[in-house]
Every structure is written in C-alpha cells, then in structure tokens.
C-alpha cells in the first residue's frame, strides 16, 4: 500500500501520525544503510521511515504527480518485516517429504505472495503462501490507490492467518495448475486481490494438460513454451 504522509508544518523532521486515535506529531525515523557492491566500496544511503514504512524519495518517477506539497509517500509491504523468513522457508521446502510437510514449512514464507504447487506420490495441491494484509472495512481505498497515512482506518490491522489461506488438495479434475488466475470459485472469507490473471491462459494450460494421459519432460517443455492464444 502507498500512504500519503503529511509533514508537520512546524517541523519538517516530523510527520502527522495517529496515536491513540489522536493525530499527533511524530519523529521521522532515520537510519543509515550500507549497500554492498562486489569488488567496490559499499554505498551508504539514508533511509527514512514512518509507521507505515519507508519513505520514497521525491525523485521517484511520477511521484510528484500524486503527492501534494507538504506531504511525502511511504510504502507498506510484507517484505519489509524484519522477521521475514521467506528464504529459510524456501530452503526448508526443498527438504519436505510430502505435501503436508511442505504446507507446514511454508508458514514462514512472507513475500511475495505466491501459489505453490505441491506434489508427492499420493497427493497434489495448491497452497497460497505469504503474508496477506488485513485492512479495515472502513479503509478509504482498500489498497487500490494511495491513502492518507494518519487516518486510523487506513492502517493495516495485521495479516490473514496462514491456516486460512486458500489450499486445494486433490481436486476432482486431477490437475493443479495456475497462471495467476483466481484459484477458488467459492466465496472466500478474506480479501486477497482485486486483480487476477485472464482466463484464457489457464484454459489453454488445462487443455494441454488434459490432452495426454501421461506427460514427459518434453511435453512439459512444450507446454511451457506454448505461444497459442485462444483469444487470438
């Protein structure tokens, strides 16, 4: 989510934040970060943050078009969580012995949110893994476009419990596949996304998978490199 933060008119080192349901002035957090560069000296940059996340530099392309004077933009992303253990989750995933074990390992995966296709000798499954933000029903923009950072209802309220993320095990079709399409047709209690991939690609993929009773490495290569568009 992109947040528009209002700079304190009386002190440009502070911004307006909601504290205990009251708009109050708060210090902008500042820290030095060293970017390591192979075979070259590291580069030190200054990172500024609000409660909603890092502040984007005003030189960012197009930012001045949406940020009014006296304001700045901060970005919230699950990947900024200092407790992010996504890399460890992926390493542990490679040591999984079955679908259930793999599903359990992905609880530590934070970002980016992904669909994982899991297969063992007896089961096939799709597991949505990653930290999916929870937003208030009163959130002004639902994360679709920038919102004011000092409005309480616009703040994230946490993340969807991993155990409630969509999980499909052994579907009747006998196929698990995904092309960024919506993976469940039924009503889902938690919001995940407003935008999904088109239906043409998943239809084409499903058709190719259903054409053969048995697949080989080459048949999967052919599917991966397929360029036919149903729409065209």
Model-derived features: positions:
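Mature extracytoplasmic enzyme cores
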Residues: 1-232
